[in-house]
């Protein structure tokens, strides 16, 4: 029983109120990622960079621009060695992530049975119908963005796309690395090597295209993020950012703090003000509610700027 309780404490989903951080007694931050989650992310993106640096010159080794890179990294053998080592680390990171998710599911099975999509918000679920509202907003048929939750559409798409991509590029990478094992011991036809090469290469092009053209703009290069969203490093987001981008999550966190730790509202009057605002704004129709929340976020930002300049 002691081991089980220790296991549950280690992998238990954080309560909503635990995501709110009070900095210097006057500033609210929201914690999105734990240290371990950030390390997993660093492992994936750092090895991905090395995969690109070494993989594309190998694919286009006859093209002039690739030759200096190949020479710099020890020729074809050197490039292949670095590519394989970084690929092995990347695939290990992926497997560790899968194990981590399984352990979280086991430790929170009671919550999963109660409300799977409510607690495991990274999984696409019924609330993702808000994506339709997002399209309407982009096309001008809606005045405000959707009432996004903790994970918006791009978070979920990128998270699960990495899973599919790692299966596709990882398995084919192993086949290309150890062709004699797969065609010899496992008895796969020789054509498997050519098919694996095409899948491995095309998946790499697809991954780089999506990350360079879509993901980087939405997550890092957008006007409100440029030059970078540092949440991958700090794990936290500002209150203003959370109100604007994930209003449903913000309201739920504030209400959870008020309901589960009411003493904090007495200790920090600004928290009580936030709670009263949330209660009032939730009485409004959705679009008007989102508009009021954005206005409130701008008000908080103006106060913060005045405080810094004053």
Identify the function of each model-found stretch:
Residues 1-310:
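Membrane-embedded alpha-helical bundles that constitute the cytochrome b-like, heme-associated redox core
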